[in-house]
């Protein structure tokens, strides 16, 4: 193993589209760039940590394909990022993440964490149900992840001191006090953009991603390359048709 390859955190985006969209996943469903994985990767490496991203959805990777890459990269921590462009997509995409975490737990000895909207809403329930997950992040995870990566090992004693996570200690589940979210005045420094260079591509950047059909005027040729951007965190409005409200 090449020690120079060892990285602090490997962000993995699971392949959930086939279970969600079945045969439509092959050509019709959109493939979104993993916005939050990109933001977290850029945030953590901006303070000196070595990170990488595996987007199994974009590359259509099997669990065995991913395992080979994990063994090559030898990360200290695996972070499954489970989000979607819609708020409820985090729950829909959990199936792919759990499938991978169970497979990884049987084949490698690397701590596994999850960050995403589903575990933010149900951290204790997720840990009780999913034995393959070692800990989850209970909010956006920017500062909690940095603090997790600072510790020498992921023992229960060390994890108990980290704000913004829930973790297991044998058969017991614990939730720590919340970590602060990124304030507006630190948005540009603590979330300094997207780690676009870590995304996979075939011939040119972003060519593995494709827009929803209605974004491309129902023209297949216009669907790729595709990028999606978030210009803010949260929303100041209170639309009565929004599921959040």
Predicted segments, located by residue:
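Acidic, low-complexity intrinsically disordered segments
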Residues: 2-245
């Amino acid at each position: 193993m090449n020690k120079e390859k060892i990285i602090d955190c490997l962000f993995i985006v699971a392949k959930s589209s086939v279970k969600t969209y079945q045969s439509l996943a092959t050509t019709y469903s959109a493939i979104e760039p993993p916005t939050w994985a990109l933001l977290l990767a850029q945030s953590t490496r901006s303070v000196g940590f070595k990170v990488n991203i595996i987007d199994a959805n974009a590359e259509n990777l099997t669990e065995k394909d991913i395992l080979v890459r994990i063994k090559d990269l030898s990360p200290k921590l695996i972070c499954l990022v489970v989000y979607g462009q819609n708020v409820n997509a985090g729950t829909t995409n959990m199936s792919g993440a759990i499938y991978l975490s169970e497979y990884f737990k049987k084949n490698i000895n690397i701590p596994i964490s999850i960050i995403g909207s589903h575990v933010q809403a149900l951290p204790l329930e997720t840990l009780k149900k999913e034995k393959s997950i070692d800990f989850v992040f209970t909010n956006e995870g920017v500062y909690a992840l940095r603090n997790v990566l600072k510790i020498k090992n992921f023992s229960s004693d060390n994890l108990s001191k980290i704000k913004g996570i829930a973790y297991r200690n044998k058969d017991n589940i614990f939730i720590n006090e919340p970590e602060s979210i990124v304030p507006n005045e630190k948005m540009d420094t603590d979330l300094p953009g997207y780690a676009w260079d870590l995304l996979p591509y075939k011939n040119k950047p972003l060519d593995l991603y494709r827009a929803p059909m209605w974004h491309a005027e129902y023209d297949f040729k216009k669907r790729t390359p595709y990028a999606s951007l978030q210009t803010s965190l949260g929303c100041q409005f209170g639309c009565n048709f929004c599921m959040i409200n």
